[in-house]
Regions:
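Histidine/acidic residue-rich metal-binding segments in metalloenzymes
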Residues: 6, 99-111, 129-217
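Generic hydrophobic alpha-helical membrane-span motif
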Residues: 32, 88, 187-189
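Alpha-helical hydrophobic/aromatic positions enriched in membrane-embedded helices and signal peptides
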Residues: 16-20, 74, 173-175
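Hydrophobic faces of well-ordered beta-strands that scaffold small-molecule active sites
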Residues: 21-27, 86-88, 115-122, 144-148, ...
Length: 217
């Protein structure tokens, strides 16, 4: 009988588990497993800004139990692959309100002995519009990191820099990190990484701010 040869994926996984396991620092577990064959064509023909709102259907129709089931499925998948720490954004906005984050905390309690879970609020509706700001403020007290998407407020109101101020103020006042989506459109006109660096210094948040995506650098 021929000796079994492990796949490269299995080899890498097993070696990393020996050294303490993976860290998944960026996920959207509340929306995991929601893609369908019918949606693929729609998403394929939509730009990123449109996708920010296309997910409203899932958010609007998902109950706490629905979110909880997706969190549990995501967490168990991470554990099965040797992930020992899992950071995920969680939608908290006027569409889904606090249903997703309530489910997230419920799941964290169940798996607290199996994996480290950290949450950041996802602000697809921005932080400038009053109702969006209300849910941002509520969500900021329910997460481990302040998440942000300044370009949403730049597109809608021309207030991307003001949105950064709100994000950094929220993080600083709570003594937690800030995790910001910037420069996602691969355009030389985008300067969000530089702007976020300037705002980080202005707010005295050096070493406590993460910029993610950054493909326009």
């Amino acid at each position: 009988m021929r000796n079994h040869v492990r796949s490269f994926k299995t080899f890498i996984r097993d070696e990393i588990i020996k050294k303490g396991g993976w860290v998944n620092a960026h996920a959207h577990a509340d929306r995991a497993f929601t893609m369908t064959p019918e949606k693929i064509g729609i998403y394929h023909n939509s730009n990123l800004q449109q996708k920010w709102d296309l997910v409203d259907e899932v958010k609007r129709t998902s109950s706490v139990d629905d979110y909880y089931a997706r969190f549990c499925q995501s967490i168990e998948l991470m554990i099965s692959q040797g992930v020992t720490a899992f950071g995920t954004f969680v939608d908290i906005d006027p569409i889904c309100e606090d249903r997703a984050i309530i489910a997230a905390h419920k799941a964290r309690e169940v798996y607290k002995h199996d994996i480290i879970l950290k949450f950041a609020n996802q602000t697809l509706k921005g932080v400038i519009e009053p109702e969006a700001r209300k849910w941002f403020d509520i969500g900021s007290d329910m997460v481990d990191m302040i998440g942000g998407l300044p370009y949403r407020d730049e597109l809608d109101y021309g207030l991307g820099l003001e949105a950064m101020d709100i994000l950094l103020d929220a993080a600083k006042s709570r003594g937690i990190m800030c995790h910001v989506h910037v420069d996602q459109f691969n355009s030389p006109k985008e300067k969000e990484t530089e702007q976020l660096c300037d705002k980080t210094i202005e707010h005295g948040m050096e070493g406590r701010v993460v910029a993610i995506h950054g493909i326009s650098i």
